[in-house]
């Protein structure tokens, strides 16, 4: 039998950079979701402060495998 996946959308943020924003979103997802298998970056944006980039924001679609019943 094939596997079934569910997708959720998350937004990770970081003042450090894009990779840190992705890692923040995935770290939080791991606390409540099991069987995380993949992610896709859907959107990249940020906020601007007086000195330049204030915060990076990455919208992710995360796929996780549903458990068989």
Curated annotation (Swiss-Prot):
This is Dodecin. The keyword Flavoprotein applies. Homododecamer; four homotrimers assemble to form a dodecameric hollow sphere with an outer diameter of about 60 Angstroms. Flavin dimers are bound between subunits with a stoichiometry of 6 flavin dimers per dodecamer. Besides, trimeric coenzyme A molecules can be bound between subunits. A dodecamer can bind simultaneously 12 flavin and 12 coenzyme A molecules. Pfam families: Dodecin. The lineage of its organism: Bacteria, Thermotogati, Deinococcota, Deinococci, Thermales. GO terms for molecular function: nucleotide binding. Belongs to the dodecin family. May function as storage protein that sequesters various flavins and other cofactors, thereby protecting the cell against undesirable reactions mediated by the free cofactors. Binds and sequesters FMN, FAD, lumiflavin and lumichrome, and can also bind coenzyme A. InterPro entries: Dodecin, Dodecin-like, Dodecin-like_sf, Dodecin_bact. PANTHER family: CALCIUM DODECIN (PTHR39324:SF1). FMN binds at residues 3-5, 37-38, 45, 57, 65. The record marks 65 as: May be important for ligand binding specificity and FMN binding. Keywords: FAD, Flavoprotein, FMN, Nucleotide-binding. CoA binds at residues 6, 28, 32-34, 65-67. Changing residue 45 to A: No effect on the orientation of the bound flavin. Changing residue 65 to A: No effect on the orientation of the bound flavin.
């Amino acid at each position: 039998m094939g596997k079934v996946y569910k997708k959720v959308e998350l937004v990770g943020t970081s003042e450090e950079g894009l990779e840190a924003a992705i890692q923040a979103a995935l770290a939080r997802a791991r606390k409540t979701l099991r069987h995380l298998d993949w992610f896709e970056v859907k959107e990249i944006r940020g906020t601007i402060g007086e000195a330049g980039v204030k915060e990076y924001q990455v919208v992710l679609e995360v796929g996780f495998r549903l458990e068989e019943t």
